[in-house]
Amino acid sequence: MKFSAGAVLSWSSLLLASSVFAQQEAVAPEDSAVVKLATDSFNEYIQSHDLVLAEFFAPWCGHCKNMAPEYVKAAETLVEKNITLAQIDCTENQDLCMEHNIPGFPSLKIFKNSDVNNSIDYEGPRTAEAIVQFMIKQSQPAVAVVADLPAYLANETFVTPVIVQSGKIDADFNATFYSMANKHFNDYDFVSAENADDDFKLSIYLPSAMDEPVVYNGKKADIADADVFEKWLQVEALPYFGEIDGSVFAQYVESGLPLGYLFYNDEEELEEYKPLFTELAKKNRGLMNFVSIDARKFGRHAGNLNMKEQFPLFAIHDMTEDLKYGLPQLSEEAFDELSDKIVLESKAIESLVKDFLKGDASPIVKSQEIFENQDSSVFQLVGKNHDEIVNDPKKDVLVLYYAPWCGHCKRLAPTYQELADTYANATSDVLIAKLDHTENDVRGVVIEGYPTIVLYPGGKKSESVVYQGSRSLDSLFDFIKENGHFDVDGKALYEEAQEKAAEEADADAELADEEDAIHDEL
């Protein structure tokens, strides 16, 4: 996203907008540049204008009131550029707001090319400057066509990566380039600088390193494929060593690469380590990403990486396998007694990265201690013995992965206990187990929610099977019989147990009757 001098708010517009808000309200003043739309005027207005930002609001909404002065300021600036900011009061136009699926207030939607049926949600900062910058971006073409690329890059200010095609451009790649530009309109700036005398080049200029463009060095025929282009962008358009927070986390996940975290205490400490991590990131580009994370704001995230909150720290998360790696840390006692700040050794960081990429590093496995006493027929697994137990070729092992707070897990517990009792009292071929996933890491198991139930059939080459059925006793019996290696009929065992229990109850009743009769005779 680029901004020119014309996008900067003028002092006059700032003063004008602020003067009309002596008492702050959600509704823009009548003499402002904000257009009021209603159900009977909305469609016609959108269809007759190329670009409109519409605020769906409620007069009582506190967030709407807070944003109102900024919205008016932005409208005063953008009206000169033929960009309209509008308001729709949802308390008076409920059907219109329902039609556009307004989830809450304020909701800001961008309508482009007079299209009333398709809109883009504005999710940026609710300040006049941010709104102006974003809307000016929306008014520009998806691809900036320039004759003098160096001059263009030097004279503009960019806050998102700049994707540039230059030199001799063929039709196939050009179509892909424009398609990607439209898809990622708000993510990157796309620039085309065609010159038939030069060789084709595809480059990415990162805002933090405009003098070091990343150049695509593969085959042009490959990158003309949109999927290949997308994957290349996901990796190369990320900064070498950038700051991570909730707004950019998804981009790192989508890259599919492991993520190295530097947790830092303050900006001075960050600057101390920045050269090292920038160099590591350049050296290992395409293999893993590196980010800094402010421990003052996101220190608890260290726990998600199986690390203690002892900062600074360095850890690696292999998100594909959900494995975590980190430099050794102090005991709690040693950390409490520490008088000097922790220093991360460059060689230790480099060594961990090298070993991780070679597959030689050992992950940090979170695990409870192995339960010495199993006082239930449901076997309690932990991270340390999970693989050993589930890979036992002499048993079909059913595992319930749960969280203690999970309501569905709690409701399943009596049924699961009855399931375990049935097998435990009749056969050693089936083991019913459970694992608290909040306290134990497991490898190779995709757990997207709780409860997750997985069967590990016995035998030497059996594949695990995820249970997808209802959480009834009969369904679980059927699942184990149909997918287990030993073909154990749980229903039959259950019926036998019920019959045996009934016989024992009858025998007990007869014995009681006999004792009563003897007592009466006496």
Curated annotation (Swiss-Prot):
Active-site residues (renumbered): 61 (nucleophile), 64 (nucleophile), 406 (nucleophile), 409 (nucleophile)
Keywords: Disulfide bond, Endoplasmic reticulum, Glycoprotein, Isomerase, Redox-active center, Repeat, Signal
EC number of this enzyme: 5.3.4.1
Region forming the signal peptide: 1-28
GO BP term, pick one: protein folding
Site (Lowers pKa of C-terminal Cys of second active site): 471
Residue ranges, annotated region (Disordered): 497-522
UniProt domain Thioredoxin: residue ranges: 29-141, 356-485
Location(s), subcellular: Endoplasmic reticulum lumen
Assigned protein family: Belongs to the protein disulfide isomerase family.
Protein function: Protein disulfide isomerase of ER lumen required for formation of disulfide bonds in secretory and cell-surface proteins and which unscrambles non-native disulfide bonds. Forms a complex with MNL1 to process unfolded protein-bound Man8GlcNAc2 oligosaccharides to Man7GlcNAc2, promoting degradation in unfolded protein response.
Name assigned to this protein: Protein disulfide-isomerase
Organism in which the protein naturally occurs: Saccharomyces cerevisiae (strain ATCC 204508 / S288c)
Annotated gene: PDI1
